[in-house]
Amino acid sequence: MDLKLKNLDETKELAETFAKCCTQTESSCVIYLIGDLGVGKTTFAQFFIRYFGFDKVKSPTYTLVETYQNDRADIHHFDCYRLTDPEELEYIGIRDYLKSNSLQLIEWPELGKGSIAKADISIKLSGNAESREANISFESKLGRSIKKCVIG
């Protein structure tokens, strides 16, 4: 599925739609956020997480993971950009994060290959500050069920 995102409001709307649809499942959902620096991966993640009532959402670039928990959601936001070896994810206990019934947003998933779960949904962002494109792949049975909600 390919979408043009003409402005920040459209990115926010897309992220919130995914957040709403992901919570309608009883399973953990893994979303890969793919793209070059500055294409909006972290912005998408922030809008997604804020949908659940979290006001302060920071980038996990230096911490590798930020966790957000409340009565509405259990979210783990990973940023693998600074990994020098996927094994580093094992040191922070990634398997424990992935076992929980939670939502996983993973930026730069290609750098964590072999240590991270397979994607249910992959969102590849491209473009610049003026307009972006999102190429969305629904890669699992769960992902395809979320697609039905997303496209309405």
Label the model's feature ranges.
Residues 31-33:
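Hydrophobic anchor at the beta1->P-loop junction of P-loop NTPases
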Residues 54-69:
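Short beta-strand-centered segment that lines the nucleotide-binding/catalytic pocket of NTP-utilizing
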Residues 21-28:
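Phosphate-binding P-loop
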Residues 1-19:
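N-terminal pre-Walker A segment at the start of P-loop NTPase domains
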Residues 84-87, 95-152:
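Short phosphate-coordinating micro-motif centered on Lys-Gly-acidic
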Residues 37:
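The conserved Walker
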Residues 41:
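Conserved lysine of the Walker
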